[in-house]
Amino acid sequence: MYKFILIFSKILFAQLAFGTLLWGVENTIETQVLFRKAVDGYNNIRIPAICKTKDGTLLAFAEGREAGDKGDIDLIMRRSLDGGKTWSGIEVIWDDKDNTCGNPCPVVDLDTGTIWLLLTWNLGSDSEDAIMTGKSEHPRSPWVTYSNDDGKTWAKPKELPHLRKKDWRWYATGPGNGIQLTRGPHKGRLVIPANHSDRITAERDSKTYRSHIIYSDDHGNSWGLGAIQEPLTNESTVVELADGSVMQNMRSYHGKGNRAVAVSEDGGISFAPVYLDDGLQSPVCQANILRFSWPEKNRSRILFSSPTGGKREGITARLSYDEGKTWPVSKMIHEGPGAYSNMVGLTDGTVGLLVEIGDSSPYETVSFITFDINWLEH
């Protein structure tokens, strides 16, 4: 009887797959498929980003792809008015015919309620390799759109050419969310993580990748270029620390199997030298960081989500109590293939995770997983 119960428990635990409840942990984890490849009108759907508006609406973004990383890619979205329990149908925010519209990076201005969405564009005929090696017709460029009605409608996207230096080729905003600073001399600043390749090379070369910062001090009316990080850094995520500084956590090409990190004391205009965080083991992949609670409100908690080990699998949530210095708490959320992710704090105090997961490939679905902080801590 004991063996049967043990085996049955393992089977139930394994059903974190799609649209089911994970039993055995006080019903604190739920998974919904929001986008599924070859079912929801696109052959592939990737690159999740999510935000919660000032009114509490959830906006889940992704790239709707005709094929892979190049070609006809639309920027798509689903909305939830009830904290992620139910969702609207798929809405297309930007479709530029056969061209590539992607890399969503939303940030909510809590002073004005405006949702700003940074994104990128390139010709659909141009691959990342062609763009980086100078064989494309155009480099990749940053754009912005916004919504003043809780994500119901969006302004026509506008190019931001001044945010790309002359020699830069590849360009990517996020993917994931930006933040608004809440304390210190730069309170109110909108901060967007981004990355680029800094020159043309004969072949695609990871040494040309650099993370950087985009920011706005006037509620999105204008955008400036902040700090540029050291080489071998790429897709990144940002979090505000308790003293008002900004931590940028970056995909690393240093070959050490962990994340690159740097901290800014001036809101992202300059950073201390990059260091490799031995406590954050991760494959070469996008990841996400989220401020869950502040020291003055119960306890400092910063969350981090990413695959673990050397492959894109084992989506894991980690927790830091000391402003990202150490990560003593870690639990796996999805054991199978998984890749890009983005977290959001929900109105009911739980955490929402928009993530690429599947049974045999990370790119089968973009799913919305909710979990309770008590489950993570116990």
Regions found by a protein language model. Give the residues of each.
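Bacterial N-terminal signal peptides
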Residues: 8-20
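Asp-box/BNR beta-propeller blade signature and adjacent active/binding-site loops
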Residues: 23-378
